[in-house]
């Protein structure tokens, strides 16, 4: 009897493992281009991939973001660059490159929508990647920590075409403005992408010509319309799970932090609240 019981347990485990291995992935975003190797069709948001499917990327840097059947979040990206004479290596099997995200702790550390003002710009921007939804974010800072006026200002320092660029952030009383148009247009040329790498943040005092570096990070501006469409792809998936609106909002914010990095807490909360509450 014991042997029979053990065989049943092993059988059930094998079935469970088989089902898990066959878990499908719903594409939510594609960076670059990706093609279904078997059908020859270009992948798009909403397409479903099976573990055994093969995908061909247009470049090594392209990747796919997806959600699995059990609501896990996955990135599919090549692990190693192909050799120049082996472009066929841009074709991979889904199960070999689907990697679950591991950045939920970032949201736990950085998502603080209840904060009325920022007392630590290093903690706010971080030292890795900071994203802005749309083209502008307003940052109310603590006047005790950062007294912004005609003498004390916040400056972004970065490089464009290998030339140094310094940009003073606009402000109104103690509210700072990070504005895409003003940062992208420089005397050294206009930045065509949505990212400015290695942005150093300084508190600069004009009278004494002294500066203090606060932090350094990669700044990314996220297209609001594209993000809206991406979340609209995800919403029906979550609703099919009978999730409440509050749980859906939490999931979308976690998703954002997983794949876009840290952002302004009030901005992402307002964006998700409006999207979920107004969605039909």
Q: For each predicted feature, which ranges?
A:
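Bacterial Sec-dependent N-terminal signal peptides
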Residues: 1-29
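Short, surface-exposed linear segments at secondary-structure transitions and domain or protein termini
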Residues: 51, 55, 83-88, 175-181, ...
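Short beta-strand elements
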Residues: 207-280
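Short acidic, glycine-rich loop/turn motifs
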Residues: 36, 65-67, 205-207
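Extended hydrophobic/Leu-rich segments
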Residues: 10, 14, 51, 118-121, ...
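N-terminal beta-strand/beta-hairpin edge segment
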Residues: 53, 60-65
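Beta-strand-enriched, solvent-exposed domains that form extended recognition/catalytic surfaces
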Residues: 120-226
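Flexible, surface-exposed loop/linker segments and immediately adjacent secondary-structure boundaries
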Residues: 23-48, 54, 68-138, 142, ...
């Amino acid at each position: 009897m014991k042997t029979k019981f053990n065989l049943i347990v092993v059988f059930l485990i094998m079935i469970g493992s088989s089902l898990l291995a066959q878990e499908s992935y719903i594409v939510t975003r594609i960076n670059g281009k990706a093609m279904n190797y078997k059908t020859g069709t270009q992948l798009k948001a909403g397409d479903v991939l099976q573990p055994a499917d093969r995908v061909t990327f247009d470049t090594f840097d392209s990747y796919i973001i997806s959600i699995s059947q059990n609501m896990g979040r996955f990135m599919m990206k090549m692990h190693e660059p192909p050799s120049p004479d082996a472009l066929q290596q841009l074709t991979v099997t889904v199960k070999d490159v689907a990697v679950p995200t591991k950045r939920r702790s970032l949201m736990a550390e950085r998502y603080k929508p209840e904060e009325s003002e920022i007392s630590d710009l290093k903690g706010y921007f971080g030292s890795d990647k900071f994203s802005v939804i749309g083209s502008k974010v307003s940052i109310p800072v603590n006047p005790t920590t950062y007294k912004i006026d005609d003498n004390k200002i916040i400056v972004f320092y970065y490089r464009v075409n290998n030339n140094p660029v310094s940009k003073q952030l606009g402000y109104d009383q103690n509210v700072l403005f990070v504005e895409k148009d003003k940062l992208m247009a420089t005397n050294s040329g206009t930045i065509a992408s949505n990212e400015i790498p290695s942005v150093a943040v300084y508190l600069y005092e004009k009278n004494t010509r002294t500066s203090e570096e606060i932090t350094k990070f990669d700044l990314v501006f996220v297209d609001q319309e594209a993000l809206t469409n991406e979340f609209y792809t995800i919403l029906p998936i979550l609703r099919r799970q009978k999730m409440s609106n509050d749980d859906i909002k939490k999931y979308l914010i976690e998703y954002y932090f997983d794949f876009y990095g840290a952002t302004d807490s009030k901005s992402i909360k307002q964006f998700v609240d409006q999207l979920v509450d107004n969605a039909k």
